[in-house]
């Protein structure tokens, strides 16, 4: 307790000097913290994240062609099966789609179309309302079908999750908001009726229980809403739904061998020119190429600042110990053991390191967060890179405790206790 009290007294003895040392260390640590956070957030593997964190999404480019006769179900069951049979593939999820109309009715359809025209159209809804009422086939939209796993993922992202059984049974659906200024409360609970585009007599009514802003679930974006339902319900309702896209997840993330095998399947397919894909690996490669030497430059800046901060601390503490040689020698002469003396110096170092990190993790983190959000155009969640942070904590505490200890060990060799008290060289 006495040693701890002496360390604290020395730490608070010269507030101005202590503040300068703490701020110097905290500034270096804060810049380090800021740079490693930015580098981690902009790393290719952090930026790149396909929907559901899949490794590849294969798209059927014919699915959204304007003329229905030009659309072909090229992502058929046999092709998807060949993907599933690949040893490196862990999950495959296909999204199906059918073109629909949403017949006019005075409640939800009317509200939706009014808002759609107000938001996106240059002409008033009143000018085209009659056409919509009498010829809904001129206002096509999409019915999207997703499997149970994709539903679970989507449902977890909703502000108001929906009943799974209602969704799978076909009682409930989710609607894509399409950027309209309609709240969940405006939409949820209303009924929406859709009819097959090629057969207006075949219709189905859903209760809207959820609303999403995720544009992954879109095909032909028409004026009426895009409806998302269970794929089994869509298959029962529609005559020939088309597979719009297939997402693939590998057992091993960023597995280039598996990806090459999938791409080989695409190239061998007779419809190769009608496929497109999004690849996490390709996106990461593009980002790394675009970033060039940015990570190395950032690390270089971090090392320079760390060196400056450490040298500043060393210089300050060496001078501090030198100026206290007489005081420390007197303590040693009246019975303080070398172990106790070194323990006191170590505690002082811990106080400096702890104080610097306190400033870094409050003020420094606040500044880092503000800078991060100002440049966060991709909407990546703020997170602290734990390993670089723990590394910096370890190094800073090691330096802050070892510098005073080594300084004392070197300086005490300059003479006996009596000589040091008298100030003899």
Regions found by a protein language model. Give the residues of each.
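Feature of multi-pass inner-membrane transport and sensor proteins
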Residues: 1-22, 384-388, 406-425
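Alpha-helical membrane-protein architecture signal
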Residues: 3-8, 12, 19, 280-290, ...
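Short, strongly hydrophobic transmembrane alpha-helices
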Residues: 15-41
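Alpha-helical transmembrane segments of integral membrane proteins
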Residues: 21-31, 295-315, 352-360, 391-392, ...
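Sec-dependent signal peptide cleavage junction
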Residues: 36-50, 317-320, 373, 407-415
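Basic-flanked hydrophobic alpha-helices used for secretion and membrane insertion
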Residues: 40-298
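Short helix-loop junctions at transmembrane helix boundaries
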Residues: 284, 288-291, 340-344, 353-419
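Interfacial "coupling" helices/loops that link adjacent transmembrane helices in transporter permeases
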Residues: 309-351
């Amino acid at each position: 307790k006495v040693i701890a009290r002496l360390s604290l007294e020395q730490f608070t003895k010269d507030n101005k000097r202590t503040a300068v040392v703490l701020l110097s260390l905290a500034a270096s640590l804060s810049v380090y913290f800021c740079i490693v956070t930015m580098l981690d957030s902009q790393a290719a593997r952090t930026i790149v994240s396909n929907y559901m964190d899949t490794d590849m999404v294969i798209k059927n480019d014919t699915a959204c062609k304007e003329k229905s006769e030009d659309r072909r179900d090229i992502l058929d069951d046999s092709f998807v099966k060949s993907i599933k049979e690949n040893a490196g593939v862990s999950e495959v999820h296909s999204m199906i789609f059918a073109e629909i109309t949403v017949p006019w009715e005075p409640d939800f359809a009317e509200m939706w179309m009014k808002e759609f025209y107000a938001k996106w159209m240059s002409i008033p809804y009143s000018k085209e309302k009659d056409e919509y009422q009498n010829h809904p086939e001129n206002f096509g939209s999409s019915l999207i079908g997703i499997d149970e796993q994709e539903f679970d993922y989507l449902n977890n992202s909703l502000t108001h999750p929906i009943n799974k059984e209602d969704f799978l049974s076909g009682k409930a659906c989710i609607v894509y908001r399409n950027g309209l200024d309609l709240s969940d409360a405006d939409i949820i609970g209303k009924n929406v009726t859709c009819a097959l585009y090629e057969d207006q007599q075949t219709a189905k009514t859903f209760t809207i229980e959820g609303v999403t802003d995720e544009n992954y679930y879109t095909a032909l974006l028409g004026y009426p809403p895009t409806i998302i339902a269970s794929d089994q319900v869509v298959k029962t309702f529609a005559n020939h739904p088309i597979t719009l896209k297939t997402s693939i997840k590998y057992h091993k993330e960023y597995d280039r061998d598996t990806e090459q095998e999938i791409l080989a399947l695409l190239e061998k397919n007779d419809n190769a020119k009608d496929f497109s894909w999004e690849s996490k690996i390709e996106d990461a490669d593009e980002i790394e190429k675009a970033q060039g030497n940015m990570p190395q430059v950032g690390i270089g800046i971090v090392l320079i600042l760390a060196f400056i901060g450490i040298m500043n601390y060393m210089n300050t503490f060496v001078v501090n110990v030198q100026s206290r040689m007489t005081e420390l020698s007197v303590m040693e002469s009246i019975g303080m053991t070398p172990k106790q003396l070194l323990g006191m110096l170590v505690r002082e170092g811990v106080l400096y390191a702890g104080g610097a990190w306190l400033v870094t993790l409050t003020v420094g983190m606040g500044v880092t967060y503000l800078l991060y959000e100002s440049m966060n155009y991709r909407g990546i969640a703020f997170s602290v890179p734990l390993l670089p942070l723990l590394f910096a904590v370890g190094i800073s505490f090691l330096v802050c405790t070892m510098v005073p200890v080594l300084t004392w060990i070197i300086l005490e060799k300059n003479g006996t206790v009596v000589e040091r008290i008298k100030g003899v060289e």
